[in-house]
């Protein structure tokens, strides 16, 4: 079973006192004390980000680790990744993440891990990366960016958290710079099983997610049912 959990925002890095999304991700592995690996690539392997990951996940019933491409934990990245139950990708610069992953061959390794049942998840840049394309500020202004294409469609994180995200996503789809896709508020996460949206969950009441597309020459937002984890 292939699983991807794409967060618009939230999780330990944005809600350190509310780990409900992080616990939800762990629960999908169906293993007691799942082995979870954090990929902080998009942040430039920020040590502060890595420390916050451990601070959060050491309070949960799991075995946390991380993969830095600046200081790889193993010369055999394939075996290291394939031994994990969950891969959790942090936020930051999506373009840099994609370039580094491709240079190291990590994009192919992660695809094989996903196909073999490793749960893959991420926030912001770590969510955009799984789709065909997404809205990113990697180069400054919000623009479109081609991504890995594990999932069909585009993705926009921080839909309610950053005021320019929603209008930028609408404009990019309207002008055919992006294909139709999904948008998620901070605190909302889309859970895909075998390439199909299974459900949407949230760490806070009121967090929403949408299917966004062109309909009769206008942008249409279709609200998705959201299961509140509180």
Swiss-Prot record:
Gene Ontology biological process terms in this record: proteolysis
Gene Ontology MF terms: serine-type peptidase activity
Gene3D superfamilies: 3.40.50.880
Disulfide bonds: none
InterPro entries: Class_I_gatase-like, Peptidase_S51
Enzyme class: hydrolase
CDD domains per record: GAT1_Peptidase_E
List of catalytic residues: 124 (charge relay system), 158 (charge relay system)
Transmembrane segments: none
Keyword Transcription regulation: no
A Pfam family assignment: Peptidase_S51
EC number: 3.4.21.-
Keyword Hydrolase: yes
Protein keywords: Hydrolase, Protease, Serine protease
Family: Belongs to the peptidase S51 family.
Protein name in the entry: Uncharacterized peptidase YgaJ
Biological source species: Bacillus subtilis (strain 168)
């Amino acid at each position: 079973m292939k699983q991807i959990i794409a967060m618009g925002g939230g999780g330990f890095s944005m809600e350190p006192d509310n780990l409900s999304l992080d616990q939800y991700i762990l629960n999908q592995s169906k293993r007691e004390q799942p082995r979870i690996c954090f990929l902080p690539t998009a942040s430039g392997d920020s040590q502060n980000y890595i420390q916050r990951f451990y601070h959060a996940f050491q309070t949960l019933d799991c075995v946390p680790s991380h993969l830095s491409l600046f200081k790889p934990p193993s010369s055999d990245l394939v075996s290291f990744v394939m031994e994990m139950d969950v891969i959790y990708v942090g936020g930051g610069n999506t373009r840099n993440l994609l370039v580094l992953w491709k240079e190291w061959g990590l994009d192919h390794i992660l695809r094989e891990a996903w196909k073999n049942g490793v749960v893959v998840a991420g926030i912001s840049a770590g969510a955009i990366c799984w789709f065909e394309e997404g809205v990113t500020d990697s180069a400054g202004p919000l623009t479109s960016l081609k991504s890995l294409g594990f999932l069909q469609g585009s993705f926009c994180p921080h839909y309610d958290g950053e005021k320019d995200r929603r209008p930028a996503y609408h404009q990019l789809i309207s002008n055919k710079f992006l294909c139709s896709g999904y948008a998620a508020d901070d605190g909302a996460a889309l859970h895909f099983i075998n390439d199909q949206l299974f459900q949407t969950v949230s760490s806070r009441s009121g967090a929403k997610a949408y299917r966004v597309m062109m309909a009769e020459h206008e942008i249409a937002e279709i609200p998705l049912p959201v299961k509140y984890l509180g």
